[in-house]
Amino acid sequence: MGPGRALLQPTADQRARALELRSLLTQAVPTPSPPGLLLSGGLDTSVVAEIAQGRGLREALTVIASEDAPDRPFAREVAGRLGLSHHEIVTDLPGLLEDLPAVVRVLATFDPMELRNSVVVARGLREARRLGIPEVLTGDGADELFAGYSFLWSLPPTTLRDRLDRMAAGMRFSSFPLGQALGVKVRAPFLDPRVVAFAAGLGREDLVGSHDGTTTGKVLLRFAFPEVPEAWRRKDPIEVGSGSARLPEFFQGQMPPRAFAEARHRIRREDGVVIRDAEHLAYYQVFQEVFSDHPPVRRGGPDPCPHCGFELPDPSSDFCVTCGAWPARRPPPPEPAGPIPPAQ
């Protein structure tokens, strides 16, 4: 620990609340446990593994889409320490994209952030099915309930609580529909109603704090499981931990600037859809191929997204789950002026 830094320690009241949270999560993991776990090696899945080990959890699955994927060493450590059979699904970006059409069909979206993460989830679930694992655990919900996302950490207490309440009310996770499509049941202990209700009563001091000089979220969850070596690991989203975060660069390298500019201009003119970059274009093209003229999401209704025309989830939502626009209620930027870039 460097000079001037301090390790975050719980107060007496926080220790009591941490014990309550530990008890609730322990009850939320069924006995016997599902035999499989989608394991990233981060705090959330490590906590689930800690509870489920000894209740029937035997197999851990980790998707690795790049040689330096941050999840790999952490997931190996967790699986090894708990004696789990660890399946590393090693692939590259083109291999990961083999699941893209199926994921688009199930989720009915061309949102880059959603798909970048969900192709990883789909690959893990597909491997579970191949291995004959009928049911898996996930860490879904912890970030939304306990302020795991860095964009929340600077918010004042009242604003933070309001934002978390709205996030909890609108939580949706691709693992459930993808698992259903693949015939693998998904269980998420953090989404147990008792855990959700408990999290709704927490204040900022239980959610955000400074530990060893670094601001972090999910403070009470970390206090509840101090024996987990990954308790203070930084938050890496699925796309970062697995390596799928390189997909934007990958698609940009596949698309010459002139071809992208022409496609973006044509799609906006003909379809009324704003394409943001080459990755977004690739996903929209798959969306078109999968659904043709009959997407399962409504278009042209009373509350359309200005960026794609598809219906927004609800009147209070400022995020489009179909195209990924945020803030979705702000008018899109005008089409860039000037000539289309020359061919390279």
Can you say where each PLM-predicted feature lies in the sequence?
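Short, glycine/charged-enriched secondary-structure capping and boundary segments
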Residues: 52-54, 74-77, 102-104, 150-154
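ATP-dependent adenylation/pyrophosphate-handling site
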Residues: 5-11, 28, 34-82, 88
